[in-house]
Amino acid sequence: MEPIEQQLTELRTTLRHHEYLYHVMDAPEIPDAEYDRLMRELRELEAQRPDLITPDSPTQRVGAAPLTAFNQIRHEVPMLSLDNVFDEESFLAFNKRVQDRLKSTENVIWCCELKLDGLAVSILYENGVLVSAATRGDGTTGEDITSNVRTIRAIPLKLHGDNIPARLEVRGEVFLPQAGFEKINEDARRTGGKVFANPRNAAAGSLRQLDPRITAKRPLTFFCYGVGILEGGELPDTHLGRLLQFKAWGLPVSDRVTLCDSPQAVLDFYHNVEKDRPTLGFDIDGVVIKVNSLALQEQLGFVARAPRWAVAFKFPAQEQMTFVRDVEFQVGRTGAITPVARLEPVQVAGVLVSNATLHNADEIERLGLRIGDKVVIRRAGDVIPQVVNVVLSERPEETRPIVFPTHCPVCGSDVERVEGEAVTRCTGGLICGAQRKESLKHFVSRRAMDVDGMGDKIIDQLVEREYVHTPADLFRLTAGKLTGLDRMGPKSAQNVVNALEKAKATTFARFLYALGIREVGEATAAGLAAYFGTLEALQAATIDELQKVPDVGIVVATHVFNFFAEESNRDVIGQLLAEGVHWPAPVVINVQEIDSPFAGKTVVLTGSLSQMSRDDAKARLVALGAKVAGSVSKKTDLVIAGEAAGSKLTKAQELGITVIDEAEMIRLLDA
């Protein structure tokens, strides 16, 4: 066997292994970028020796064979994959190939859309009624997931409108919004269930359940992006026209679809989407660029596994492989001890990553992680990098177990893990320097007391020099004392003192959030402030009374009650008030006198809003007598669903709660 034959055999075997893990087992072991690199290497070798290309080479087919647990559906029109480009130069080369093949010097009109990171499916409608659905599988044969797809509320069981074809097969992506993914994992950690590495794995695992009742509980959604079978009807002669027609028939289509009349316009779209990526609420890994004209698509045709008229322009990889060199333990403001992996530095999504959170002891056990392991690191948007999985097939011989500390690594106090909780905590309280630092950093943060110019390094020095022990001590600082800190001149010191003085005027909700009560985030703090109105009323509340507040259950109510029952906490609050911290007296709203459909209602916002910010929407709703909650419960009267609404929308539908969209909310606000 020639050396190149050996290389080809090894590459094909490796790629088939990873295709099986990705497409069949929903448990990928390597990042997409590494798979793409291996595929490029195989293509390049096959280009050198086309006589060695085999029919079953991964370059000649799509995906992997389907699971035998599902019935199989043969695709009458193959579900092909897309070729990829990874930089501007490669895209411009693709654009030129298209123009050359069309023998045209004029710019092609491109239809650009999002490349969703979910599971490709085909859905067949006969006379407008959903009759079957299948996964991509190997592109020729997929798995019959009809029963599961019927549980996805975004997918219509019957199309509506005129001129619906007798047989119409739509293609699209089933995916899981970020909020739904976090809720699934949160529930799994609480119940000891399977924790998913990323939303794509969660979507695939949810869609390919043998029991559709499990799928029905998962907040999956769907966007349509193409067509397979078309019989007994017609569709528009452009890709965008077809998407708009699908939308008119009731099929969900992404609103981020744009026509571009030049290569530069495509690049602008790519960069704008890349910038907006962290705020979309769901995962994408690039944009898809298609020739808009169906006539030109037919003229361009296909290669073995992909169309010549479309390409996926992928973003820089958000996942990379590296090694865990050590694990250290950090202490947070509530005493939570968090293991942090120290990594061999690696570039991920344009950022050099050398640390990744490991969350807790359960996560380390779930991963089966040891120091020295080769791991996959993921960094999405502004999220702290995390270890996705261990590459067990490449585990080095010299690895060692991770041992959780029995004493606080900062103050030496005992650590404890309360039954039913995943977190291990230091019991040292404010005698622990780490907890003191983190509590003060939280207190001055932008969404809390918002002390401009007081960064982490200043807090670190103030605690280390014992200038500050409690939040009230901050307001006693003088410019003279601050000037003694590193890199703090007289002008900067005075600016910090001025910022502290300005921060004394706050709101009741911000003040509560700044106190750092366990489990009390911004939304809960706002709910407590709105419900009780005054600090005195809140401090006097019983656990039962606290649970009357939207989103406050027994756990949160107990934490709030215990916080105010602690004499040292009441003392700190008294000192803060004595130093001049204040907020406006509550405005008593008589909902009986407000003529608004929102008056007296408990309202939940979910998804992203396009017409106004979430804060503005909350403010207007509260002004009209509504109580804005952060989660859906039986107490909820109304849910307002924006784009990419996730688990909250699903729960509202399960509970039979009224749901309106953003347009209807604005109409009612302006009524």
Swiss-Prot record:
Q: What are the protein's UniProt keywords?
A: DNA damage, DNA repair, DNA replication, Ligase, Magnesium, Manganese, Metal-binding, NAD, Zinc
Q: What EC number(s) does the entry state? A: 6.5.1.2
Q: Where does Zn(2+) bind?
A: 408, 411, 426, 432
List ligand-binding residues for NAD(+): 32-36, 81-82, 113, 136, 173, 290, 314
Catalyses which reaction? NAD(+) + (deoxyribonucleotide)n-3'-hydroxyl + 5'-phospho-(deoxyribonucleotide)m = (deoxyribonucleotide)n+m + AMP + beta-nicotinamide D-nucleotide
Please report the stretch or stretches of sequence annotated as the BRCT domain.
593-671
Tagged with keyword Ligase = yes
State the Gene Ontology terms under molecular function. Answer: DNA binding; DNA ligase (NAD+) activity; metal ion binding
Q: Which residues form the active site?
A: 115 (n6-amp-lysine intermediate)
Query: One GO BP annotation here?
Result: DNA replication
Supply the Gene3D superfamilies for this chain: 5' to 3' exonuclease, C-terminal subdomain, 6.20.10.30, BRCT domain, DNA ligase/mRNA capping enzyme, Helix hairpin bin, Nucleic acid-binding proteins
Q: Its family? A: Belongs to the NAD-dependent DNA ligase family. LigA subfamily.
Q: Record's PANTHER family?
A: CHROMOSOME TRANSMISSION FIDELITY FACTOR 18 (PTHR23389), DNA LIGASE (PTHR23389:SF9)
Q: What is this protein called?
A: DNA ligase
